[in-house]
């Protein structure tokens, strides 16, 4: 008799995806982040669902409803901080996952990569809208500044901004629709993640060597399930430590001041995970130019497969490209730091240099270096 997991119509799908899936035997811990992202999404949906039961999307009561959750609801403080810091863990895993894809050449699986970029944009949009919901000073002014960027679009810009706001400023209509979208989008993210996996399982996973591993595959369970559980335990330990010991470490003090349209905070800045893009936006003096640079800082990932000039898929055996990759990581950390600094000398100059370097590495230096490596290896 056939095992039920191989014959049952529903269990068969799960079996082919998570149990009997043939997987390269050489996957390192860099391949853990996909499953960690899945766990992050589940944690965010569950904590978000319970928070939504107590939240009111009205400008007069939103701030007080969040305070009420923290003070009066059983373990409400835990839910709130798990949700806020869970977003930080989500983005840490997300950036590691994208970095892994860049380093090991996983972008050559273009369908999977493009769905991944769409996922990245959707997660960023969801996080931005969630940041607005507590209706604090930074929420309100962050929403005003970022949505206002759309007014840089020629001809339709101003109308588009007012359409998104639902009025002539960020107000009740804006908050209500942001709450609606913030609740809806995670389920769309879950659906997209399934499509992401569907395309991945069409080609099979990449591996650290970048060499086809069809002759050396092992079942996903028990080998990689155990490995993923270890990664999960490490992530949950870090998240628990963050939530229980220092829940406001990654936040901003202005998030404890109710929104006041008449008083602008001294430094308007987004959460830490958007600071690199914010620094690129600020480094260009022109509004439209800044908006284009902001969008391109993420959309540039879509052209990476077309710029792959190396004869090897992975960077494992390419030391020159490795140096450039780690320079890119350092550059992104620099941009993140600059994004949180005031707009004054020398931060403006450092931000402009780092922004130019970011685009130069991805668009110019990496393809050229790959060609040089091909010649050095006489390929």
Swiss-Prot record:
Q: Which SUPFAM superfamilies match?
A: a domain/subunit of cytochrome bc1 complex (Ubiquinol-cytochrome c reductase), Transmembrane di-heme cytochromes
GO terms under biological process: mitochondrial electron transport, ubiquinol to cytochrome c
Positions of heme b b562 binding: 83, 182
What residues does heme b b566 bind to?
Answer: 97, 196
The membrane topology term of the UniProt record is: Multi-pass membrane protein
Q: Which residues cross the membrane?
A: 33-53, 77-98, 113-133, 178-198, 226-246, 288-308, 320-340, 347-367
Q: Which cofactor does it need?
A: heme b
Where is the protein situated, by its record's location annotation?
Mitochondrion inner membrane
Gene3D superfamilies, alphabetically?
A: Cytochrome Bc1 Complex, Chain C (1.20.810.10)
Cofactor remark:
Binds 2 heme b groups non-covalently.
A cellular component annotation (GO) from this entry: mitochondrial inner membrane
Q: Which keywords label this protein?
A: Electron transport, Heme, Iron, Membrane, Metal-binding, Mitochondrion, Mitochondrion inner membrane, Respiratory chain, Transmembrane, Transmembrane helix, Transport, Ubiquinone
Which Pfam family, any one, appears in the UniProt record?
Answer: Cytochrome_B
Chief location of this protein?
mitochondrion
Share what the entry says about its subunit structure, partners included: The cytochrome bc1 complex contains 11 subunits: 3 respiratory subunits (MT-CYB, CYC1 and UQCRFS1), 2 core proteins (UQCRC1 and UQCRC2) and 6 low-molecular weight proteins (UQCRH/QCR6, UQCRB/QCR7, UQCRQ/QCR8, UQCR10/QCR9, UQCR11/QCR10 and a cleavage product of UQCRFS1). This cytochrome bc1 complex then forms a dimer.
Extra facts:
Heme 1 (or BL or b562) is low-potential and absorbs at about 562 nm, and heme 2 (or BH or b566) is high-potential and absorbs at about 566 nm.
Function statement: Component of the ubiquinol-cytochrome c reductase complex (complex III or cytochrome b-c1 complex) that is part of the mitochondrial respiratory chain. The b-c1 complex mediates electron transfer from ubiquinol to cytochrome c. Contributes to the generation of a proton gradient across the mitochondrial membrane that is then used for ATP synthesis.
The protein in question is named Cytochrome b
